[in-house]
A protein has these predicted regions:
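Outer-membrane beta-barrel domain signature
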Residues: 1-2, 36-43, 73-79, 91-95, ...
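Structural signature of outer-membrane beta-barrel channels/translocons
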Residues: 14-18, 55-57, 71, 89-93, ...
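Transmembrane beta-strands of outer-membrane beta-barrel pores
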Residues: 17-19, 28-32, 70-74, 90-92, ...
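Outer-membrane beta-barrel "beta-signal"
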Residues: 85, 169, 195-207
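Repeated loop/turn-to-beta-strand initiation elements of outer-membrane beta-barrel proteins
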Residues: 18-24, 61-64, 96-100, 134-142, ...
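Transmembrane beta-barrel domains of bacterial outer-membrane proteins
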Residues: 1-51, 67-73
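Membrane-embedded beta-strand positions of outer-membrane beta-barrel proteins
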Residues: 24-26, 52, 66-68, 84-86, ...
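Residues that define the transmembrane beta-barrel architecture of outer-membrane proteins
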Residues: 3-7, 44-48, 80-84, 98, ...
Length: 207
């Protein structure tokens, strides 16, 4: 038998004017499992990220974006991955209770792994993404995001990031966030899995 202890924290901030939209988000997740028979503990998850995006609407629905993401995952032996990018987006629907947008652009990726070789990579990628959220019962938000990032120099190398969840308010700023997070890396560090799927329940702070 094992005893697991996990912590999941996140924040999400967004501001919208007539022609600009700014969003910033971050997340931290750690999990430790303890073998009750041997009393030995080992870390099964330890990762975090910060990301931000600025959108400039040159029409009511069309926008250009600048974004950046920095992430680290000790279990995946990822020391860091930094991804600044630019692109074009289209806001198909924007309402108080329903939003849907798509994006396409270019991203520069620089990463370093903590394996024996200390592998370092930098390359250009494309980026395709969509964002969907729908609010029910006036306050409970359902959301789904998907991001596909193929290496332009090697078609066999790509990343997929996706999540789907439910966010329910506890206070005016604090929400309970229950979600599935999926990440796929076609070229991970040695002896590491390509797929990482997590089922998280945690707290999110809304600005």
């Amino acid at each position: 038998n094992t005893d697991s202890t996990s912590v999941s924290l996140g924040f999400d901030a967004a501001r919208r004017s007539e022609i600009f939209r700014l969003s910033v988000a971050g997340s931290y997740f750690t999990e430790e499992q303890k073998d009750l028979s041997t009393k030995e503990s080992h870390m099964t998850a330890d990762n975090w990220y910060l990301k931000g995006q600025a959108d400039w609407f040159f029409t009511a629905k069309n926008f250009f974006y600048l974004n950046a993401k920095y992430e680290r995952d000790r279990i995946a032996l990822l020391d860091y991955r930094f991804m600044p990018g630019v692109g074009y987006g289209y806001q198909w629907i924007e309402r108080d209770n329903f939003n849907f947008s798509t994006e396409a652009g270019l991203t520069y990726t620089k990463e370093e792994y903590m394996d024996e070789d200390g592998e370092k990579n930098d390359f250009m990628t494309a980026r395709f993404a969509y964002h969907l959220d729908y609010t029910v019962l006036s306050k409970v938000k359902l959301y789904h995001n998907l991001e596909y990032i193929p290496n332009l120099e090697d078609s066999g190398v790509f990343l997929v990031n996706a999540d789907a969840g439910v966010q329910a308010p506890l206070t005016a700023r604090l929400s309970l966030d229950s979600k599935i997070v999926y990440a796929y890396n076609s070229s991970p560090a040695d002896d590491r899995y390509r797929t990482d799927t997590r089922y998280l329940v945690g707290l999110s702070w809304l600005f």
